[in-house]
Amino acid sequence: DRDSCVDKSKCAKYGYYYQCDECCKKAGDRAGTCEYFKCKCNP
């Protein structure tokens, strides 16, 4: 789910990141972005 994406994904400080994107899409969201090394999912 969405929280697991945030918890397990390390990413670049800013911008899109492939693993976040994949995880967020599996959680049913449109895309994932990075903010300060954490994934954020965009519904």
UniProtKB/Swiss-Prot annotation:
Keywords, sorted A to Z: Disulfide bond, Ion channel impairing toxin, Knottin, Neurotoxin, Potassium channel impairing toxin, Secreted, Toxin, Voltage-gated potassium channel impairing toxin
Secreted keyword on record: yes
Pfam families: Toxin_17 (PF08086)
Disulfide bonds: 5-23, 11-34, 20-39, 24-41
Record InterPro entries: Ergtoxin, Scorpion_toxin-like_sf
Tissue expression as described in the entry: Expressed by the venom gland.
Localization: Secreted
UniProt domain comment: The presence of a 'disulfide through disulfide knot' structurally defines this protein as a knottin.
Described purpose of this protein according to its UniProt entry: Reversibly blocks Kv11/ERG potassium channels.
Family affiliation: Belongs to the ergtoxin family. Gamma-KTx 4 subfamily.
Protein name per Swiss-Prot or TrEMBL: Potassium channel toxin gamma-KTx 4.4
Organism field: Centruroides exilicauda (Bark scorpion)
